[in-house]
Amino acid sequence: MPARIFFVVGTDTGVGKTVFSALLAYHLKRSGRRVKVAKPFCSGGREDVTILAQSVGFEGNLDLINPFSFALPVSPLVAARSEGRVVSLDDTMGFVRSVASEAEDLVLEGAGGLLSPLGECFDSTDILEAIEADPILVAKNRIGVVNQVLLSLRELERSGHTSIGVVLMGEEIPEESGSSNVGVIRECAPTARVFELPYLGG
């Protein structure tokens, strides 16, 4: 049976994708599932990859989780070009399918925002179109998030996805809008499954 793939994407960088991905992977593993984690692209260090690895007790080579790692803290496309490297969608999908073949559940974490360029002429929506995955959109529960989430949902729906999870990650110091954002998103996007989590660090 093919693995269930949970593709965790974000409205932006630094919104809590890694924290949520690690939490989801840990929960799935605790429930007895054979879980793999993967973050194909990472720029500016591998701290996020290490957190993912720890969530499932992985102690092997991080290249097996994160094959496309770059030094420069910019979008993966720009970072790859700065190192004279080219990453194609075929390269990416070959990696994703290989990891998925070894798991019951794969928690796949994207990089940056939903439309951030990952490689030559592709982004996270192209990966979603190439695999059967449940997209989970992560965003910070702060002012402006309603617009960001609705724009991202519109793009995901345009790509053919109608069952989308949305997770709003709490801020260390909650903002005034934090108490109403979930309700407004549910009202404006009734088909999305919207959840909120408290501040979890990161």
Question: Where do the language-model regions lie?
Answer:
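N-terminal phosphate/diphosphate-binding loop that engages ATP/GTP or pyrophosphate donors
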Residues: 19-86, 90, 95-98
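Conserved catalytic-core segment of NTP-binding enzymes
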Residues: 14, 30, 43, 111-195
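Extreme N-terminal starter segment of soluble prokaryotic enzymes
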Residues: 1-7, 33-34
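Generic beta-sheet signal
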Residues: 4-8, 104-108, 135
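Switch II (G3) loop of P-loop NTPases
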Residues: 92, 96-120
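Glycine-rich phosphate-binding P-loop
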Residues: 7-21
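General beta-strand structural signal in soluble alpha/beta enzymes
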Residues: 36-39, 63-66, 106-110, 137, ...
